[in-house]
Regions:
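Catalytic machinery of carbohydrate-active enzymes
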Residues: 1-328
Length: 328
């Protein structure tokens, strides 16, 4: 039997974590460990992964086979497959690959010619031991106040009001996240963590590696975030997750754990739940056809504010309910 190689053509944290259900399924299909090829910066996501034989960067993979005839190699010596191919590109029939309209866990599987069942959609991360030496209390909340596209960024004012609420109620709060630059088709987004006042807790943004971030989330009573890479990482932990509302339909990103989307998870929607980023009727409105992705970053109803965002009142009421009922 030939060795199997899966090459993952994405770099962002969340999109890459969404590959792990496909990797796990291929492992069980072949009943052996799989070779995986990823960008160098993504290797951290697969540390300790028990389904991987050898983990290669693109450069390491090319170096390994540089003296081989490629066509002979993939026809006779190895099985080679790629996932996350050609976002926004039309296929031979003219149909655009619209990743905004597909669960990313299924994108990776679909590229290999199959679909994952609901009970196969959970993601994996296998961290190193917790190395952080910071003394943390037993009970704490983690928040991820990162910037993103405007329709996926809760305002600085809202985050500050949330921090004020948590501080007033003596809830130790840890800020996490990382400054990154994400490049997608026609969109470049700088993601960074704002600074806040009146924090009863610690700001650990840009201070933790991925394994330590996993442990930070796994040991937290509660994690609060919008749709983000850390949402997918949190989906590999046992923490309680509050996902804040945005223009993206949560059904494309909410974690599967324990066979359900509802395990230790609440989505707090805003007044508007049209989810225009993923709603294909806006493709018709913008382009006159469903065969294009609508603009991704703004409000496609042209409202003066993002009504899809959670209200601070709904968020604080939810936290109060969870704590008063000993759910977290």
């Amino acid at each position: 039997m030939r060795d199997v190689y899966l090459s993952v053509n994405c770099k962002t944290l969340g999109d890459t974590i969404c590959f792990t259900p496909t990797l796990r399924k291929v492992f069980y299909i072949y009943n052996k460990k799989i070779n995986v090829v990823v960008p160098e910066e993504s290797k951290r996501i697969f540390v300790n992964n028990p389904y991987i034989d050898v983990l290669y960067s693109y450069e390491e993979f090319h170096e390994k086979f540089k003296n081989k005839d490629w066509n002979h190699l993939i026809s006779n010596e190895i099985e080679y497959y790629q996932t996350y191919l050609f976002p926004g590109v039309k296929n031979q029939l003219g149909i655009e690959r619209k990743f905004q309209h597909v669960d990313l866990r299924q994108v990776h599987a679909n590229d290999l010619g199959f679909q994952l069942f609901d009970d196969e959609l959970y993601c994996d991360f296998f961290p190193n031991n917790f190395s952080n030496s910071i003394d943390l209390p037993k009970d704490y909340v983690v928040i991820h106040p990162s910037t993103n596209w405007p329709n996926r960024t809760w305002s600085h004012e809202s985050w500050q009001l949330l921090i004020n609420f948590l501080s007033k109620n003596n809830i130790f709060t840890i800020i996490t996240g990382k400054t990154t630059v994400q490049k997608e088709k026609n969109v470049t987004t700088e993601k960074y963590i704002n600074k806040f006042e009146n924090l009863y807790g610690l700001d650990l943004s840009d201070n933790l590696d991925l394994s330590d971030t996993y442990h930070l989330l796994n040991n937290a009573k509660l994690f609060i975030t919008l749709d983000s890479g850390l949402l997918h990482l949190a989906g590999t932990t046992d923490t309680f997750i509050i996902q804040l509302g945005s223009a993206k339909d949560p059904r494309f990103s909410s974690p599967y754990r324990k066979g359900t989307r509802n395990y230790k998870y609440i989505y707090i929607k805003g007044k508007c739940d049209l989810f225009c980023t993923n709603n294909m009727k806006y493709s018709i409105k913008e382009w006159g056809t469903m065969n294009n992705v609508p603009p991704l970053t703004g409000c496609l109803e042209n409202k003066p504010t993002f009504e899809c965002h959670s209200s601070i009142k709904d968020v604080t009421n939810t936290i109060t309910y969870l704590t008063n009922n000993n759910i977290v």
